[in-house]
Structures are given as C-alpha cells and as structure tokens.
C-alpha cells in the first residue's frame, strides 16, 4: 500500500503527522509526505533519517487559514494532482480540509483536527465582534473552502466525537465520518522516574485557547512550570521565575522557553501533575505525553477532555482559575489521590491512545476505502 500524506510544520499537528507516518512505514506501508507551511528545521525532520520507505517532499505553501492563502492553495492543488498522477498512491491522507475536493480518482481522507470556525466558537473574546468587510470575505471564502473539502472527501476523520460534531455543525456532515483517537508511542516516555512536587503545563501564555494564564491568578502550594511560552502576561499574581527547572526550593511560577523533545520528556517524567487548561483542544497531544509519563491530570471541564479522559482526570470548573487552584491544592495535600490519578491516566493512555491502535484503525479505513473504490470501478 502507498499513502500520500500531507502535514504542516507550524503547529502541534506535526507530532501527530510524525506518529502517523512512522507507524505506517513500520507496518510496511510506503509513504510520501508533503509538508506545508515553513520549510522545516533539521530538528523537525531528524526522525526521518532512518525511516526507510518514506519519500519526503517539503514545500512552503501557505496553510488554508492564513491570510492570502488562496493563491497558494490553487498552486498546491496543482502540485498535489501532479504528484498523485506521477506516484499513483492508493490513498490520499490530507491534514488540510481544502484538498478533500481534489479532482483525482484516488480515495481522499481528510483529518479534521481543528479549524477557525470552531476555534472562534470556543474562544469568542479573542477576536473582534466587528469584522472589516475584507475579513468577512476572507472568512466566507475560508468557510466555503473547508465545506467543499469536507463534503467531497471520501472520509473525514476527527480525533474525537466532540470535534466531529463541532465540524459537522459548523460546515456540513461528511459523507463518511470516522473517529480515530490520537496516539503516541509509549516507548518515548518514562513513567518510572521519582516525581517532583510540581505542576507542568505546555503552551504559550499569549494563546487564548490554551488559557495558561489561569495558572498565574493564584499562588499555589507547589512550583508550576509553563513550557513553550514566548512572553509573560502583565502583572501575574504569582511570582514568575525564568528558568527551565521544574522543582524549586520556593513556591513560584517558572516560565520556560521552548524545549527540545528530550528536555520536554524529562520534564514530563519529573512532574507529578499536568495542568490541561485549554478551552479548545481538538488534538490533545501534550496531555497524552503527560499521561504516558504517569502524571496526574488536572483538566478543564470541557467536552473534549471528558470524552478523552473520562474518570482518569481530575476536572476543575470550566475556565475557572479558583477551581483550578483548588484542584492543585487537593492533589498536593492528598498524595494517595495524586498517585491514583496518575495511575488512571497512565492506564487509560496505554489502553486507548497508543500509536499501534491508531495505525490499526487507519489501515482498516484505508483498506475499506480502496475496496469501495475498486468495487465501483
């Protein structure tokens, strides 16, 4: 089997794409990977070095949600059609909506892991109510582009039933819809290290959908480390330190710069608690990584987290900093409860969110789509 996969190098979905591609290749699938966005840095592609059976084609085409993306989208469509004609893959797997309507006689899978309309629905205060006419036209054009891709794809895959329902409500119900939960390879994470009394969170403070600022609104009884932040917010109520160490001798909030994957895995392994504060989290890869590292999960009470983690996480009242602080205090005071939640998260990740399970489900979908296309020929 030969699968042509597209991905983007600018978001956290690149980790998902890597898991998908690596998992397919190790199962004997030939993969051609086309990346959009920026040409990746060497650190972003080092995982490909010993992956035999992968043909990588980097491009700098804009992503469909970017300003002035329409011209790039047309050029990228021509490029993909030419590549499909040259390589004749068995399946096209797109991580962009717009190429779901590519006019080729090959099964097209679209992965719906996030979009502008459902993001704006979840984070309404992060964009102005009054939109300039040019922006309204761009918004309408974006919606129409995404709708066409969803409506004409042979299958649309979402990482959760919640995401699938939101996409269907915002655009249209796909002809064929599948929920395939994301996966990570547990071999990359260490769940056996002695834990430090600390809280870890991953994301940018300026990203309203991550709302990591909730962690700055109260003083906590143990250190908190936010990784990947590019700048602090104005006047946090909790004193901020700027280093990369998780545990400290004094209670504080540490703002860490971007970390390498090895550094981040070490932080996961040492952190006792992971704070999943997002109000919009369609993919949720950082939470998977924390769970595979046996962190206790404190999660914002949103439908996506409830679906993914069930009783394996401790939830705080939706978007409420005081409730988050109370949950942190609870797990700090009750070590047995903290260990129990860590075990629950680890067990749920091992049971439901491995790369192997994800690849099994994708291969089943691919084979079914190929069979349907062959029978119709």
What does each model-identified segment do?
Residues 313-321, 330-336:
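Conserved acidic donor-binding segment of nucleotide-sugar-dependent glycosyltransferases
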Residues 279:
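Aromatic "clamp/platform" in nucleotide-sugar-dependent glycosyltransferases that forms part
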Residues 266-271:
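Short alpha-helical donor nucleotide-sugar binding micro-motif in glycosyltransferases
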Residues 296-299:
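Short hydrophobic beta-strand element within catalytic cores of glycosyltransferases
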Residues 237-262:
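Nucleotide-activated donor-binding/catalytic signature segment of Leloir-type glycosyltransferases, i.e.
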Residues 151-152, 158, 164-184, 192:
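Helix-loop-beta element that forms the nucleotide-linked donor phosphate-binding surface
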Residues 193-227:
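Conserved donor-binding/catalytic core segment of Leloir-type glycosyltransferases
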Residues 110-147:
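Acceptor-binding helix/loop patch of EC 2.4 sugar-transfer enzymes
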């Amino acid at each position: 089997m030969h699968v042509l996969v597209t991905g983007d190098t600018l978001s956290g979905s690149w980790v998902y794409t890597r898991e998908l591609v690596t998992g397919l290749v190790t199962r004997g699938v030939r993969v051609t990977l086309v990346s959009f966005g920026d040409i990746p840095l060497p650190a972003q592609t080092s995982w490909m070095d010993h992956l035999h059976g992968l043909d990588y084609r980097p491009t700098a085409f804009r992503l469909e949600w970017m300003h002035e993306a329409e011209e790039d989208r047309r050029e990228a469509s021509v490029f993909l059609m030419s590549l499909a004609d040259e390589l004749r893959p068995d399946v096209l797997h797109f991580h962009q909506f717009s190429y779901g309507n590519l006019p080729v006689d090959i099964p097209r899978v679209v992965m719906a892991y996030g979009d502008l309309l459902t993001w704006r629905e979840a984070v309404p205060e992060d964009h102005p109510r009054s939109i300039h006419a040019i922006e309204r036209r761009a918004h309408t054009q974006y919606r129409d582009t995404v709708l066409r891709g969803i409506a004409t794809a042979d299958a649309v895959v979402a990482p959760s039933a919640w995401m699938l329902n939101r996409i269907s409500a915002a655009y249209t119900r796909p002809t064929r819809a599948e929920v395939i939960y994301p996966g990570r390879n547990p071999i990359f994470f260490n769940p056996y290290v002695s834990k430090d009394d600390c809280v870890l969170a991953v994301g940018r403070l300026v990203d309203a959908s991550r709302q990591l600022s909730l962690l700055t609104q109260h003083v906590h009884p143990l250190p908190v480390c936010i990784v990947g932040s590019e700048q602090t917010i104005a006047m946090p109520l909790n004193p901020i330190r700027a280093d990369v160490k998780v545990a400290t001798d004094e209670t504080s909030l540490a703002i860490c710069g971007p970390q390498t994957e090895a550094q981040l895995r070490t932080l996961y392994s040492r952190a006792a608690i992971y704070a999943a504060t997002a109000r919009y989290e369609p993919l949720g890869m950082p939470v998977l990584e924390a769970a595979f590292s046996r962190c206790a999960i404190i999660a914002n009470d949103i439908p996506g987290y409830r679906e993914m983690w069930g009783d394996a996480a401790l939830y705080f009242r939706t978007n409420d900093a005081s409730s988050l602080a109370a949950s942190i205090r609870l797990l700090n005071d009750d070590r047995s409860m903290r260990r129990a939640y860590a075990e629950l998260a680890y067990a749920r990740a091992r049971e439901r969110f491995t790369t192997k399970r994800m690849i099994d489900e994708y291969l089943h979908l691919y084979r079914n789509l190929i069979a349907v296309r062959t029978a119709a020929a």
